[in-house]
Amino acid sequence: MESSDITAEIRMAVLGEWVPPQLADLLALQRAEEPETHAVLAGWTDPGRGAEMPDDGFDFALSAVARQWAGWVCEPLWHDTLAVAMAKRSHLLAYREVPCQEVLKQSVICSQSTTHESWRMTVQRVFDDVLHEREQAVETFDVAMTLVGAGYGIAIAPAARLASYLHRGVAVRPLAGAPTIVMAYLLRRNASLSDTQARFARRARLVS
């Protein structure tokens, strides 16, 4: 593979339907510290094919799912905590942190598009796998949040992922006792990085 020091370009594939907000901070840091090296993003939305690579034309990939690609390393990159999304008129707003037992009294809306994301498994562990009984599945996260805003139920997801829906009739509270979760993974080749690539990876790890 040609060194990105020669091409002065970092190519990153962004996998899945959601882009972590930290990516904007990473790109801004890259521009400020190394403006001569351009970061080129390529979106790729197909969460159902977690074991496959979209193509071979990139240096890094950013994913909400831990992926196993031959010849690549997948490392946890950015972390978050679980939160509860609810309608702005919900009685759950009385809680500073929503207790798990209150969640189990509600209809919980989840999206099929996030099924393979690691935080979904964490949610089930927190509730000892009994949450399935209360879940209503819809196709996408956007549809799930639309129903939440309309008062049809609540949703559980990383706090940063819910933040962008606050202007759509949705309120957010932390989930009481929730563990820290991995929100995004960085994938890179299992080989020596060029100096340019190594600096980009270091900046990615510095962003929180």
Feature annotation, model-predicted:
Residues 1-13, 32, 70-73, 94, ...:
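Short helix-loop hinge/linker segments at domain boundaries
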Residues 7-68:
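Central regulatory/effector-binding core of bacterial HTH transcription factors
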Residues 9-15, 61, 85, 109, ...:
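Short, well-ordered beta-strand segments
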Residues 10, 22-25, 171-208:
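A late-sequence structural motif
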Residues 23, 106-130, 193-197, 201:
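Secondary-structure junction motif
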Residues 45-50, 54-57, 64, 114-171:
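Hydrophobic hinge/microswitch elements
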Residues 70-76, 80, 142-192:
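Beta-alpha-beta core module
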Residues 72-82, 86-108, 198:
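Flexible hinge/capping segments at coil-to-helix
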